[in-house]
Amino acid sequence: MEVPNIQTCIDSGQFGLKEPWCPKNSNDKYGGVLTLKKAIAGSINTVTTFLMKQIGPSPVSSMAKSLGITSRVPVVPSIALGTLDLSVYELVGAYTAFGNKGLYTEPIVILRIEDKNGVLLEDFSPTTREVFSPEVAYTVVNLLEGVTESGTGIRLRHSGGKYRYNVVTDYPYNFTNPIAGKTGTTQNNSDGWFIGMVPNLITGIWTGCQDRSAHFGITEFGQGATTALPIWAILMKD
């Protein structure tokens, strides 16, 4: 599927909007057509808005709940761009369905409790449920692999511009193994995210302040690829 990279508006009256919603790309660049994989890799808002206009926010909100999101998910178009507040716990849990062939697995902290003699007192098993087919899960993982192959997470693969040596911690990383993931950056560069998946492991990183008035002045410094992704990379290398 290819989508034109043009600013897309959802008109007032649609999905309960009181005024038109016309989000821009973060770099304010447009033109050409993009595959979904390329658009996700580059965090292209116009394509995400196009999809939201076709699907509507209600199915997206319902899917989020099926994926273990317990925070309130407002049924509004802007959720397509990640405007709701979620915990790392919720996001990592949601990603388990992509890595487990469509099977959501609730993250748990304690697996078993033993006494001082090693006698098992309690054994805990995570709650699981099928959310979508293995084929859908595979497709999503393939799309997310594009993020580290050619998109906002490509600095996991190679060094790029030399200026980043002074900006990104412990750079470069030079990973060659399969990695699927997604960076995230909130309004005004106050929060940075990276959720990364390798076979048998999903790890989520959030950076930011409880007070959103504390933020980076420019996206180059405040984006998830600069703030959260390096922490993920250092953790994986260790």
Stretches found by the model and what they are:
Residues 48, 79-82, 128, 220:
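Conserved short-loop catalytic and cofactor-binding motifs
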Residues 50-51, 81, 181-182:
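Thr-Gly-centered strand-to-loop micro-motif
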Residues 38, 42, 87-238:
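A penicillin-recognizing enzyme superfamily signal
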Residues 18-33, 70-78, 154-171:
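Short, charge-rich amphipathic segments
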Residues 53, 65, 99:
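Short polybasic/polar patches that bind polyanions
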Residues 1-60, 104, 114-146:
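Conserved catalytic neighborhood of penicillin-recognizing serine enzymes
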Residues 10, 14-25, 56-93:
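Mid-domain, small-residue-enriched loop/turn segments at the edges of structured enzyme/sensor domains
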Residues 1, 77-79, 108-111:
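Extracytoplasmic/periplasmic beta-strand context in beta-sandwich domains
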